[in-house]
Design a protein with these regions (language model features):
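Residue-level signal for inorganic ion chemistry
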Residues: 16, 20, 133, 193, ...
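Short internal beta-strands
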Residues: 137-143, 255-258, 280-285
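Short beta-strand-to-turn element immediately C-terminal to the catalytic PLP-Schiff-base lysine
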Residues: 224-227, 256-259, 290
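Flexible, glycine/charged-enriched surface loops at secondary-structure junctions
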Residues: 15-22, 86, 162-169, 244-251, ...
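N-terminal Rossmann-like NAD(P)+-binding subdomain of aldehyde/semialdehyde dehydrogenases
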Residues: 1-100
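Active-site PLP-lysine loop of aminotransferase-like
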Residues: 217, 238-256
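Rossmann-like NAD(P) dinucleotide-binding subdomain of oxidoreductase/dehydrogenase enzymes
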Residues: 81, 90-232
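NAD(P)-dependent aldehyde/semialdehyde dehydrogenase
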Residues: 88, 260-310
């Protein structure tokens, strides 16, 4: 597998921007054209998830619909529109003898990505790797195995249709945890490993991997409301950031408010958040502000702990 990925990486490293973009456009089109096949596989994952009593948030991350597939396809086309990073000059200088020295961006080679059970990440990861001229080996969450299998098949077929190597996108999902362990030990075969998920997953990979790791964040997205902010707009932003899709990793998790507007803003914002079913982990100042407010369900307010800020 890694030998095939290495050969595919060599091809992609020399591919033109036009060729790579054609591959991405083919992937975007195939996601829409083969939606029924993808959704049938996703239905298998969803049924298994419900049988295993997955939480509503995790099920929402796992779920695909035709609208979500169109959004994923649109995201691929947004990557097409991005400038090609390969060959970009980062910096340069001229030596005393007139020699021009430049630092340019080049593909890494073969990238391994280990991530949670979100099918859209399969497409995001594959598309970004292709755009940057890399081959990618994927290990998605087991809950999305059926969805990922079909999505990777769709991507590989799309690349083949425009003359790019299918082995630029591969998966070790069928090997389960053994596949993830093999990726972590593939020093020299995989050039960089990127974990995406919770702190436990990321820390385990950072500690155990023999392959260089690009460490990502674990979430805890912040929103800050300054004293000069438009409070109505801020309220709308926090509602969208938290309640649009509560289960995704970029949903807002920490709200910081300037003391000058805390009294006015927090009562209104927390009223809307708790009404929408959001439990508030409040510090002492916030609890003092909202305590006894008739518009706020007291059962939805719990004391914040140190771990809430991590």
């Amino acid at each position: 597998m890694t030998d095939a990925a290495r050969e595919a990486a060599r091809v992609l490293a020399g591919a033109t921007t036009h060729a790579k973009n054609r591959g991405l456009e083919a992937i975007a089109a195939a996601l829409v054209e083969r939606a029924d096949q993808i959704l049938a596989a996703n239905a298998e994952d969803m049924a298994r998830g419900r049988a295993e009593q997955m939480s509503d948030g995790l099920l929402d991350r796992l779920a695909l619909t035709k609208d979500r597939l169109r959004s994923i396809a649109d995201a691929v086309l947004e990557i097409v529109a991005l400038p090609d990073p390969v060959g970009q000059v980062v910096r340069g200088s001229r030596t005393d003898i007139g020699l021009r020295v430049t630092q340019e961006r080049v593909p890494l080679g073969v990238i391994g990505i280990i991530y949670e059970a979100r099918p859209n990440v399969t497409i995001d990861a594959a598309s970004l790797a292709i755009k940057a001229g890399n081959a990618v080996i994927l290990r998605g969450g087991s809950a999305a195995q059926a969805s990922n299998r079909v999505l990777i098949e769709v991507c590989r077929d799309a690349l083949t249709s425009v003359g790019l190597p299918a082995d630029a996108i591969q998966s070790v999902d069928e090997w389960g945890r053994a596949g993830a362990r093999a990726m972590m030990r593939a020093r020299g075969a995989i050039d960089a490993l990127i974990p995406r998920g919770g702190a436990g997953l990321i820390n385990a990979i950072v500690e155990e991997s023999r392959v260089p790791v690009i460490e990502t964040g674990t979430g805890n997205c912040h929103l800050y409301v300054d004293a000069s902010a438009d409070l109505e707009a801020a309220e709308a932003i926090i509602m969208n950031a938290k309640t649009q899709r509560v289960g995704v990793c970029n949903a807002a998790e920490t709200l910081l408010v300037h003391t000058d507007v805390a009294q006015r803003f927090l009562v209104a914002a927390i009223t809307r958040l708790t009404t929408a079913g959001v439990t508030i982990h409040a510090d002492e100042v916030t609890r003092a502000i909202v305590d006894g407010q008739p518009s706020i369900d007291a059962d939805m307010i719990v004391p914040a702990t140190e771990t809430d800020w991590e």
